[in-house]
Amino acid sequence: MKNLNGRAHNACYHPYYQQQLQQQQQQQQQHQQQQLLQQQQQQLLQQQQQQLQQQLQLPYATQYTQQQQQQQQQYNQQQYYNQQLQQQQQQQQQQHLLRQQQLLPTQSAYQQQQSKQSYNNNNNSNSNSNTSAANMTAMTARVNMHAATVATAHSNGNSNANANATTAAMAAMCQMQSFLSHQQQQQQQQQQQQQYNNNCAHINYNQQQQQQQQQQQQQQQLPTATTATTTNGDKLALDSASEIANFLASELFMQQLVTFDGIQSAPTLTTPTLTPTTLRTIEETIFELTTETQNVPFQAGFKPPPLTSLCNVTVVNNNNNNNNNNNNNSSNNNNNNSNTVTTTAAAAGNLTLASPMSTMSTLNTNPQLDLLGFNCGSVPESDSEQSNVSWNVGGPHDDQSTTDTSSAATDSTSYQNGGHMFGNNGSNGSGVNNFTGSLAGVGSAGRGTSSTSNNATPARRGGGRRPNKSANMSPEEEEKRRVRRERNKLAAARCRKRRVDQTNELSEEVDGLLKKNEDLKKEIEILTNTRHQLNFVLEAHRPTCQKVRDDLLSVTTCNGLIAPTAMLSSGSNGSHHHNSNSNNSNNNNSNNNNNSNSNDSSCGTITGFDASLNSTGRSNSPLDLKPVLIDDQLLVNIKHEPHDAGLDSSSSLDQDGPPAAKRFALPDIATLKPHSASLTTPTGPVASLNTPMSGMAPTAFGIHAKPMPKTRPNTLNVNQSLAQPGNIAIGKTPMQIEGVPIQTPSAGNFNFDSLMAGGTGLTPVSGPLVPTCSSQNKHPLELPTPTSEPSKLVSL
C-alpha cells in the first residue's frame, strides 16, 4: 500500500510498529545503563581489594589476619547450623506430605502441597542466601571499619594513608547501608511468607472439611433408594466443584508469585487477593458447568393450578388416536389406550402408575373433579376423545414460548393451564393449537384456574413487548407484524427528528430574541448617555449664551397681562421654551411659555416673576415696551393698568441703565372702583405676584390660535388714545372675561427694594392678611422702603 507521497509504508500491516521501535530503544538504553552499573560495581570492588591489600601491608597486619580467620570460622559454623536446620525442615515437610497424601486421595491437594513445598524451599534458599550475603557484607563492613580505624590510628601524615582512610570509610558506609536494606527486604519477605501460609492453611482447612463431608455422605449412601442416589450425586458434584474451585484458586494465587529475572518475588500489598466472594462465584460457575440438566417437573417456568389444596388430583388421559401434536408426555411411541397420570399436591414430582379402577374410585370420591370433567365435556369445538395432558413431566414444550416477561407469556401459561388441561386441544389434524378455543374452555371451567403463576417467578400482568416468535401465528401474520414494526420504527424516527428540529428552531429563536434584547439594552444605554451629555452641555452653555441674555428684555402678553420671559427663563431652572414639570397641556396657544411653578399659562397671570429678579433685574434696564400692530379683537381683551408712579425716572430701576424709549401710564385704582366688585388684589407680604386664575381659557383668545400659530409678541401693543387718562376713566375695559375675574397687582411703588421687602411671594414674613380694595385705596404705599426699616426677606 502507498501513501500520498507514493511511498510504501507498513501502517496497515503493522499498526504498532512505531511503538515497538520505541520499546526496543528503551530496552537498549536500559541494558546499557545496567552494563554501566556493573562496570562501576566492578571498579568499586577492585578499589576495595586494593585498599585491603594496602591495609595488609600495615604493621598490625598479623592481628587483622587473625581476626579475619576467626570471623571466617564463625561464618562457617553458622552455615553448617543453617544447613542442618534446612535438612530437618525438609524431613518434617516430607513426613507431613506423606500423611496428607494418605489422607487426601485427590490430585489437586497433592499438587498444592508440592507447589507449597517448592515455594517454601525457594524462600528458604533465598533467605539463606540473603542471610549469608548479609553476613558477608557485615563482615566486610566490619573489616573496612577496622581498617579505617587502623589507617587513621597509624597514619604518619602521608597523603596515601589519608586517601586510603577516607576511601575505606566510604566503602564501610556503603556496605552498612546495603546491609540495612537487605535486612528490610528479609523482613518483608518473612511477612509475605506468613500471609501465604495463612491463606494456604485456610484452603487446607476447607479441603479437610469437604473431605469429612464426603466420607459422611459415603457412609450414608443407600443403594436401594433412588432419591438418595440423586442427592448423593448432587453432593458429589458440589464437592468436585468445590475441589476444582479450590484448585483454581490456589493456581491463581501461585501465578501471582511470578519469577522476574531469576528473583522469586512474593505478592505485594497492592496485588488483588482472593476473597470469599470470588471463591463463591468460581464455585457457582463450575457447578453450573459440571451439573447436568435434570428433567424436573414444572420446568417450563409455571406451576399447574391447585385444584384442591389437600386431596389428590387425578387427570385421566385416554389417548385413543395418534395425533401429530408435539406435547406428548409418554416416553413410548405406540398408542396407549389407558394411561393414568396421578399428581399429588402434597409431594410434587412423585409419579406413580395406578390401575383404571383406582382412578375411577378417586374420580368418584372427588365431586369437584366430576364437575370439572362435566364442564370439559361441554366445551365447544372439542373432539369426542380427550386430548393429551399439557403438564409436561418429562420436558418443556417445543412449540410454545416459556418467557414470563411479556404479556404473551402470561397468555401461554393460561393456555397451557386451561386448554390442554380440560381436553380442549382443538387439533385439526395439523398440530396447530386453537388459542380461542382454549380461552373458551378456560372461561367455562372457571376463572380461578386460569390465573395461576409460579411463586418463584410470578407472571407480570403489565404491558411489555410480545416475544418475537409465537406458536399460533402463521407466516403471513409474522410478515405483517415485521412490516408493521418496521413502519413503526420509521415513524418513531421521523417523530424524534421532527421533535429535535423543532427544539433546535425554538432554541435558535430564543437565542435571537436574547441577542436582540441585549442590543436594545445597549442602545438604550447609549441614548441615555448621549442625553445626559447633551443636558450637561446645555447647562454648561446656558450662563454664557448671548441669546438668553437678549431675551431678558422681551415681554409676553397673555390675556392682557405682562410676563417678563427673561425672568421666567432664568427663574425656572433654565427651561426657556418648554418645561415638563406638571403643566396644563390643554393650552391651545402654542406661543405661550410653560412655567415650572405649575401655573396655567392660559389663565391670564403674571408668571415667572420671582426671586430671579434679584440676580437679573438689578443690572438690566427697565422693560422696553414697543408698539406692535396686531388684530383689533385681541386689543379689546387687553386690560388697561393704572399709572405706576414707581416706573418714573426717579425709581431705583432707572439707576442702572438708560431710560426706556416709551412708557405708558396706567389709571388709578379709584377710577376702577365701580367695576372692581370681584377684584381681589393682595398687597400684604404674603401675597405673591404669581396668583393663578381658576377657570377655562377665554374663547376669544383661543380663536386666533386654532387656525395658525402666531409668533410670540415681544412688546405690549398700546394705542395713543389709551395713553390719556380721560379715555381710561370711561370704563370700557372689561373686568371679567367669560365670567373669570381679572386680578392685577395694586398700584404702588414696585421698585426692587419694595419687592424685596416681602411682596415677592417667597416666604411670608407676618401673619396672613386678606386685603380689600378699600385698604388698597387708603394705604397705597404701605410697603416698607430701605430707608425706613431693613428688609425682612426670609430665605429657605
Swiss-Prot record:
What GO molecular function terms would the record report? DNA binding; DNA-binding transcription factor activity, RNA polymerase II-specific; RNA polymerase II cis-regulatory region sequence-specific DNA binding
- Biased composition of type Low complexity is found at 402-429
Biased composition regions of type Polar residues, renumbered to the chain: 447-457
Tell me where it mainly resides: nucleus
* Family annotation (InterPro entries): AP-1, bZIP, bZIP_sf
Q: Could you state one GO cellular component term attached to this entry?
A: nucleus
- Coiled coil: which residue ranges? none
Q: Where is this region: Disordered?
A: 109-132, 315-341, 374-429, 442-490, 569-601, 642-661, 774-796
Q: Where is this region: Leucine-zipper?
A: 506-534
| Residue numbers carrying Phosphoserine | 621
By its UniProt entry, which PANTHER family does this protein fall under? ACTIVATING TRANSCRIPTION FACTOR 3-RELATED, FOS TRANSCRIPTION FACTOR-RELATED
- Protein family membership: Belongs to the bZIP family. Fos subfamily.
Q: What is this protein called?
A: Transcription factor kayak
Q: Which organism is it from?
A: Drosophila grimshawi
